[in-house]
């Protein structure tokens, strides 16, 4: 650095020596002399003393990337890589969980499908569907307990997690109590599934994303199947055996 300053001061002193009054009467020889002086002291090519004095700095600066930062592009790529909704994580579900979930939807979908095909309302099938839905609510409450109990789980075994897991159980119990009025019992099961869905996805968001996607699919299909059963009951004639305990 000192050598660079010394060289620059020498060049400045040489320029001062060649300070000519450039004007209209300046001779061509004087202008050429000034031009040669500037070329000798400020050559566009790199000087050997400069490259020998700073070999490390030259090599380091040549490896640097000098293009401007593009934070907007990086943010846009991150936003594009992120899925738009929770349902997109359904493909990330483990195969056993996906197969068991699809098999578990059969008791929800089969009764209204049979009644639609026969165009009759069969009480025993409707009761079977309602009983399965109420049992499924108890299963959802047990999932929360099982998720909160292991050590190191993101869901701690506190009052919020454990007490909220009992909410679906109460809807299930009440649905069996009023099973004599099957339509009201089905509506109770639908309400319980909605409450469980709200607790798991919004108030207690500790489950994996693929499990949330499965819960969305199960809740929508189960609710839709229950609604079809209620429509069939009000639209088609009743036929078949009465449910157990019904006169």
From Swiss-Prot:
It comes from Homo sapiens (Human). Pfam families: DUF3429. GO terms for cellular component: membrane; mitochondrion. Signal peptide: none annotated. The chain crosses the membrane at residues 97-117, 122-142, 159-179, 185-205, 216-236. It is found in: Membrane. Keywords: Membrane, Transmembrane, Transmembrane helix. Disulfide bonds: none annotated. InterPro entries: DUF3429 (IPR021836). It is a multi-pass membrane protein. This is Transmembrane protein 69.
């Amino acid at each position: 650095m000192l050598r660079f300053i010394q060289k620059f001061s020498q060049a400045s002193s040489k320029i001062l020596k060649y300070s000519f009054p450039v004007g209209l009467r300046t001779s061509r020889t004087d202008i050429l002399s000034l031009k040669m002086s500037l070329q000798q002291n400020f050559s566009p090519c790199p000087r050997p003393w400069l490259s020998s004095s700073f070999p490390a700095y030259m090599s380091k600066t040549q490896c640097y990337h000098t293009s401007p930062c593009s934070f907007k592009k990086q943010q846009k790529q991150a936003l594009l890589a992120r899925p738009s909704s929770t349902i997109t994580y359904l493909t990330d579900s483990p195969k056993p969980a996906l197969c068991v979930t699809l098999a578990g939807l059969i008791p929800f979908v089969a009764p209204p499908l049979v009644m639609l095909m026969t165009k009759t309302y069969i009480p025993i099938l409707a009761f079977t569907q309602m009983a399965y839905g109420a049992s499924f609510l108890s299963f959802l409450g047990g999932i929360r307990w099982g998720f909160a109990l292991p050590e190191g789980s993101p869901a701690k075994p506190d009052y919020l997690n454990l007490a909220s897991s009992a909410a679906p159980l109460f809807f299930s119990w009440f649905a069996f109590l009023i099973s004599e009025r099957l339509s009201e019992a089905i509506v109770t099961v639908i309400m319980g599934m909605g409450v469980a869905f709200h607790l798991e996805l919004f108030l207690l968001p500790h489950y994996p994303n693929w499990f949330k996607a499965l819960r969305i699919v199960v809740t929508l299909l189960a609710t839709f199947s229950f609604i079809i059963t209620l429509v069939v009951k009000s639209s088609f004639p009743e036929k078949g055996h009465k449910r157990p305990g019904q006169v």
